[in-house]
Amino acid sequence: MPTPPVEYRLTTRDAVLVRPSLALCEPLRRALQDSYVEHAPFLDWVTPQVNAEQVLRSLKGAIANYAVPLAEKRLFLLSADRAEVIGCIGLQPRGRGESYVIGYWASSRFAGQGYLSAALREVCGQLPRVRLYLTTSSANPRSQRLAEAAGFRLVRTLRGVRNDAWHGTQDTLIYRREPPA
């Protein structure tokens, strides 16, 4: 199973994609705190108040996961000066690592500027021999556009399987990106 490199230098944007480190604690806490309103309808793990202890615990777990072959591997997208967290991409291996489910989020401050799209394409390009999946809510057109911009195609719709206070009943859209032939 391919393991994500320590660092990616994005060629299309002025940003860097790195493995988790404890040095990300405060920039990550700020990004999550500032993005709560936008994330809450779609990410069930977000909380309205984010403290440093929660973020450190999460980062320690993310660091430890790199020693566990089938655990999720998170990559954080940082501004070029590494002062701000732009977003995060998680890679969850399936089976024996022949495919991954990808999750992602963007800081509200950087959303819609192409950073996460470039990072997702870069990560996918580093995993050319595996099938990649991601899911999104039918109520989240930004995430759908991001998936399609990164080369994913809608392969299945699970009707009415999501329900929340923000959007009511929604579908889950399953996207797949095949390895090149």
What are these regions (language model features)?
Residues N65-A71:
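Short loop/turn motifs at secondary-structure junctions and domain boundaries
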Residues M1-P27, A31-E38, R74-A181:
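Acyl-donor (CoA/ACP) binding surface of acyl/acetyltransferases
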Residues A40-G61, K73:
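Conserved GNAT-fold acetyl-CoA-binding loop/helix
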Residues L56-K60, A67, G151, I174-R176:
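Short alpha-helix boundary/capping motifs
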Residues A62-N65, R162-N163:
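Short, P/G- and charge-enriched loop/turn segments at secondary-structure junctions
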